Amino acid sequence: MDSLTETTNALSNDTHAQGYQSVSTTRHVGHIREVVYDCVVEEFPVALIYNGISHAVMMTTPLDLEVFAIGFSLTEAIIDHPRQIYDIEIIKSDLGIQVEITIASEAFIKLKTHRRTLAGQTGCGICGIESLQQIQHTFPPVTHDFFVHWLDQIPDAMVQLQQQQPISAVTGGAHAAAWVVNGNILTVFEDVGRHNALDKLLGHLVKHDIDRSQGFVLMTSRASYELVKKCAQLNISLLATISAPTSLAIELAKRSGLKLASFCRQSRYVVYS
């Protein structure tokens, strides 16, 4: 991924660089009213443009957009390998942010053939898929081994995760996705959308060539279909979440061979597949 370039138009110097902003509010406690400032998580339109063609507009927290683009491109099967990304350019405007991604011609031909237009909402799952059959036919199997002792590492990792969410700590409004190896959290990404946080994490793993067979994903969200799909797409063998799974997430985790653990709180967790 060394050939990638990034143009941020001073993103690192504006208010979006921290992922939240301060707003004036009126707080009511009983009959007492006071004007106070509160921190809220940033939600910003980010257009993903492949070879000059707009593919999706995602509502995301405008941080870590290069790894977000890499992760999204892989988990949505737009590319088969990170080498198919030639360049990433990030351009900020008053309307939002454009992420212009240059991909190999064979990947672009495939994208045009299977193109879908997404209105990327914070709970977006399979919006834009042309038919129900696509859910079945495009789901990849997981081939990396799952190690049972990883389950014993979940409680300690969850404690660590609670201490490594700076955006959520001040806003209470961000999801987090973490990579756990040998019981320790190696990296965490936060976003207003759980699927965006996961794409950022997975893009980071790919960009830095981190061995995805040696750890698992831990998330502060429910386990939904799109999280299982994205993990399976990148051959992740365990997904652990703090909240409940959906029925489709369980079904597809079983079908793909991905281990799914949810309700990961304190020393408890429930294994669903």
Curated annotation (Swiss-Prot):
GO terms assigned for molecular function:
sulfur carrier activity; sulfurtransferase activity
Please tell me whether the keyword Cytoplasm is annotated for this protein: yes
Alphabetized InterPro entries for the sequence: Cytidine_deaminase-like (IPR016193), FdhD (IPR003786)
Quote the subcellular location field of this record: Cytoplasm
Q: Cite the binding residues for Mo-bis(molybdopterin guanine dinucleotide).
A: 263-268
Q: Name one Pfam family in it.
A: FdhD-NarQ
List, alphabetically, the GO terms of the cellular component aspect. Answer: cytoplasm
Keyword set for this entry?
Cytoplasm, Molybdenum cofactor biosynthesis
**Residues at the catalytic site:** 124 (cysteine persulfide intermediate)
Its GO biological process annotations read:
Mo-molybdopterin cofactor biosynthetic process
Instruction: List, alphabetically, the NCBIfam families matched.
Output: fdhD_narQ
Q: Which family does it belong to?
A: Belongs to the FdhD family.
Its function, per the record, reads: Required for formate dehydrogenase (FDH) activity. Acts as a sulfur carrier protein that transfers sulfur from IscS to the molybdenum cofactor prior to its insertion into FDH.
PANTHER family linked: FORMATE DEHYDROGENASE, SULFUR CARRIER PROTEIN FDHD
Q: What is this protein called?
A: Sulfur carrier protein FdhD
